[in-house]
């Protein structure tokens, strides 16, 4: 696994950034470590995103331990990518 840390950042860390983290973990874990976070959190990640990722890509974000986090909750990234907002 690479030591490069990539963080996907959006407002609530409930949908876009969670999807990006999941794809990063499943498709590029040999290239970088994926994280996601937001400037605010939600009680749970978007259930439509969870369902679609599971149905279309067989990626279970909740079983993989993903949850809504603040930027201060993750390691300092080498690369931060804003997911809009």
Which stretches of residues belong to each language-model region?
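Short polar/charged helix/loop
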Residues: 1-85
